[in-house]
Amino acid sequence: MQYIELLIMFLSVLLAVAFLTVAERKTLGYMQRRVGPNAVGYYGILMAIADAAKLLLKEIVVPTHADKLILFVSPMISLISALLCWSVIPFAPGVTIYDSNYGFILTLAISSVGVFGTLLAGWSANSKYSLLGSIRSTAQLISYELVLTTIILLCILIGGTMNVSKYIEIQQAIWYGIPLLPLAIIFFIGCVAECARPPFDNVEAESELVSGHMTEYSSSIFVLFFLSEYASILFLSTLTAILFMGGGTGIILGLKANLFAFTYIWVRATLPRVRYDKLINLCWMIFLPILFGSAIAVPAYLYALDAIIILYRPGGL
């Protein structure tokens, strides 16, 4: 039964990715004062199906000196990692594929495996552009995983549980995004960098690295990387909605997640690319010192609050 639920979830995520790509192209079209996709289906809504058909019907071109096994396996690692993260997301009360008391730890462990897909893709292609792109990607992803992990640990410290489902109940009185607004903003910036989306798309900067670690990929194996990127965007948008906006059930959670997913598109259309050294400095010189300072301040504040409550409750100590 659990395998059927996993299959339904995977297909639902892939369908959502298809519509997200259409929404992105339409939104970018409006923001750049052009029409965007409008020929395939009503209002261009079936453009994703046309794109998928075009890519899947093309020939898979494998570089002569590439390590063929790793070249084919690496996009699968990225996609499976991106899809398995969804198994701990509570879509409604009791509707979770794997409702674990260690949900956040599992999420961090599974998502970190996706870095290996990117690294191996760049190395196996035997191309300097791919290799440079994968090195950049690995450094960027590892750096910003530290940011996301630290913020999640701070939320665990405040919430007192690692079960993702519990955070919907905990935030019924007040969303974490209100008292922890600076952390929520840092978390969102970290999510954009973790997905290597503009303005942090130095991994596949067209003017420098063609398509980064995906330069030598074509047809269906390129589609796997494409799907993993957009599945990660939707997952991190949903996780942000649960952590800082109280999550929700069904359509409410979907609306909150779509709000964050739209922000990714908005940022792409608005901001220019950040220079790579400034991106890494932003993580190590600004975000991490702030977060480590918060990691000291938040427990001290919680213990002080507990002491005040104990001291002034009827009967005192």
From Swiss-Prot:
Its main location: mitochondrion. GO terms for cellular component: mitochondrial inner membrane; respiratory chain complex I. InterPro entries: NADH_UbQ_OxRdtase_su1/FPO, NADH_UbQ_OxRdtase_su1_CS. Keywords: Electron transport, Membrane, Mitochondrion, Mitochondrion inner membrane, NAD, Respiratory chain, Translocase, Transmembrane, Transmembrane helix, Transport, Ubiquinone. It catalyses: a ubiquinone + NADH + 5 H(+)(in) = a ubiquinol + NAD(+) + 4 H(+)(out). GO terms for molecular function: NADH dehydrogenase (ubiquinone) activity. HAMAP family: NDH1_NuoH. This is NADH-ubiquinone oxidoreductase chain 1. The lineage of its organism: Eukaryota, Fungi, Dikarya, Ascomycota, Saccharomycotina.
